Amino acid sequence: MKSDKITLRNMVFYGYHGVFEGEKELGQRFEVDVELHMDLSVPGQTDDLEQGINYVDVYTIVQTIVQERTYDLVEAVAENIAETILDAYSVDYVVV
């Protein structure tokens, strides 16, 4: 199976995640990188966005999870990002 990679790097958001109360009250800056692994031959050949991944939608998924939800662990943030992308797109795997 052919696998290509799309990487969105250095997405910066302000969120309220952490185990300590101060982290949740004050918030902090989070920088997120996401790798999407899949076969991109069809969108590459057809030049059709509907056959591929809309980067704006992926960015919005990450933004929503980081900015609008609260988690104790950064691992939970990453897991939720990965699961949401896997549910939304036909990708082989996601690295956050």
Task: List the model feature ranges, each with a label.
Residues 1-96:
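N-terminal, polar/charged subdomain of small-to-medium soluble alpha/beta proteins
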